[in-house]
């Protein structure tokens, strides 16, 4: 309705801190949480959880959200530009002039680099604090019972020493048994090898004949394979040479076709340019004739009995053509260009 609408005056002083929304208990979120059994002032989640010990007053307060307008990491801050480049190198040079040793200068340089790295990490990722695993799992921390351990250690040490000696004796006995078993196994293996050699002397002739027959069959098989390979190799070489020749011919044909296409495109472009230049030159000549005709007619009117034909071109187009013609004449004239660009001719 504009100015005729009813005017509603609002007082901004009723809620200057903008806390009315936090005290409002009739919104959708409060109603939904109440339906699930939650009440104002309570924590979210089960009350008897293992991590409920670590809840504080901040767990029941409102969540604060900050708008992130940059692409930096969480907690990172923009470079404020208060760092002077080259200042550290200048300080090192002054220290050398004052007679400071190279080892001390290198130590200071490493300390500065470590400090800069820590500052960068804190800006990029925030301060990192390592917590024990119990906090992550949610266990309750319990102090160790030192008294019970002290009582157990204060007992009689003599029986413990006796048990240790017994265990050592048992281990020594086991080691002796293992060595005896290994020696017996070696002896048995040697005896078996000797018996195998004695029994296998009679059958050497038969095995030698079988081995010779097998070697002959293998040699014949290898010779046949070599002959086949020799026959197949020239045929494969001829096929490869033919394939290469055909590929080269195709490549040459494709190159020729591409060159012809490029020539045709160039010729078409040249023809189009020539036509445009001819059209533009003819239109300029016509426009010059028309402008001269209009000027002469306006300056010296001639009375005649017959009606003269009126040009159908608008006055705006005629003025624009005249302006373009004048501009071209000025661009061709060197003296006019010097006047435009404020160049003094010597």
UniProtKB/Swiss-Prot annotation:
Enumerate the spans annotated as G-patch domain: 25-79
Listed Pfam families = G-patch (PF01585)
Please list the residue ranges that the record marks as compositionally biased, kind Acidic residues.
235-245
Q: Which GO terms describe its cellular component?
A: nucleolus
Q: Which organism is it from?
A: Pyricularia oryzae (strain 70-15 / ATCC MYA-4617 / FGSC 8958)
Query: Where does the record place Basic residues bias?
Result: 215-230, 249-274
Q: Which UniProt keywords apply?
A: Nucleus, Ribosome biogenesis, rRNA processing
Tagged with keyword rRNA processing: yes
Composition bias, kind Polar residues: at what positions?
15-27, 293-314
InterPro entries membership: G_patch_dom, PINX1
According to its UniProt entry, what is the function of this protein? Involved in rRNA-processing at A0, A1 and A2 sites and negatively regulates telomerase.
The name this protein goes by in its record: Protein PXR1
State its location(s): Nucleus, Nucleolus
Q: Name one GO biological process term.
A: rRNA processing
